[in-house]
A protein has these predicted regions:
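Active-site metal-binding motif and surrounding structural segment of the metallo-beta-lactamase
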Residues: 75-127
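Single conserved hydrophobic/aromatic residue that forms the stacking wall/gate
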Residues: 1-14
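Metallo-beta-lactamase
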Residues: 123-188, 197, 297
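Active-site-proximal loop/helix segment associated with metal-binding centers of metalloenzymes
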Residues: 50-52, 163-233
């Protein structure tokens, strides 16, 4: 995903750590020895109003089974999956962090694909969608209002809309996943932490600034996913704090404090998108000494 010929000095360190990166189309890694097979595909990297990239969402997978987190704001989720080489039929589990439209509405399209595929005899699998009570209630209401009776009859049968509570565990992709309330003041929102290998965990803090209640999940994460609305140097322009968001500086200081091995920044503005990787890395390196990743849409990381 990163072309060394275009890399500037300020983010060449990312090239050094390119062992973590795989092309988005690489779906069949070699099963060698005790290598960790888990991969992370970033389907979208932008905030709610971006037009030059897709809204923030991503997928985790081992082999051909996928766990998708959020769906962005529309049917572009179908294009992102297609461009990433992921079939919607391979996504067996979804988690929706909260009800904001840039995270939720893509899930309605996924529901349509599953239910319509079942109604037409084109999909024989099952899918589980997790979320807190507000998300699950809203998805049920929207499905009843927007989908046909032939489609909605599969909800509760082969399409499971399952509520999770703060601190609850589920087994997803064969691994323990713990969901937690980030105590948002805007809209109820959950994050999660996955123990994907012995001594390895990935933690998603949602799309708002870290709250101290998340420490027991986020501390010492192998991979930490955190929002960064904009550069700290451009905070006056983008006003992240008024929107209850972080800057690159804030997120990197946090990751340093939490001793995260790798930090992925997402949910960004798109006005700097042509130089985002360079500019965000340059600012972040001043505050975080671990492996800093500023993904573009469709980049894939081997965990």
């Amino acid at each position: 995903p990163i072309k060394s010929s275009a890399a500037s000095d300020v983010y060449k360190r990312q090239i050094i750590y390119r062992k973590y990166l795989l092309p988005a189309k690489c779906q069949h890694p070699k099963k060698v020895g005790r290598y960790i097979k888990m991969k992370l595909t970033i389907l979208g990297t932008g905030n709610a109003k971006v037009t030059k990239c897709y809204n923030t969402c991503f997928a985790l997978n081992e082999d051909k089974e996928y766990f998708m987190i959020d769906g962005g704001g529309g049917n572009t989720i179908l294009k992102q999956l297609e461009d990433a080489g992921i079939s919607w039929k391979e996504i067996s589990t979804i988690f929706v962090t909260h009800k904001h439209i840039d995270h939720l509405l893509g899930i309605i399209w996924m529901l349509r694909m599953y239910c319509q595929g079942m109604a037409r005899g084109q999909f024989g699998g099952e899918v589980t969608i997790y979320g807190h009570d507000e998300v699950i209630s809203l998805l049920k209401q929207m499905a009843e209002m927007l989908l046909t009776p032939k489609e909605t009859k599969f909800i509760g049968d082969k399409v499971h809309l399952e509520e999770v509570k703060d601190g609850e565990d589920r087994t997803i992709l064969g691994h323990r996943v713990t969901f937690f309330d980030i105590l948002s003041t805007k809209a109820k929102q959950f994050g999660f932490s996955m123990e994907y290998a012995e001594g390895k965990k990935l933690t998603c803090c949602g799309d708002e600034p870290y709250n101290e209640c998340e420490q027991k999940y986020a501390q010492n994460s192998t991979w930490l996913l955190h929002e960064a609305f904009c550069l700290f140097s451009q905070a006056d322009k983008f006003k992240p704090y008024e929107k209850h968001h972080s800057t690159v500086k804030d997120a990197c200081e946090l990751a340093q404090k939490l001793e995260a091995e790798n930090l992925i920044l997402y949910h960004t503005e798109d006005k700097n998108i042509s130089r985002r990787k360079e500019l965000y890395t340059e600012e972040g390196r001043q505050y975080y000494k671990g492996n800093l990743w500023i993904p573009d849409d469709l980049e894939t990381y081997k965990l």
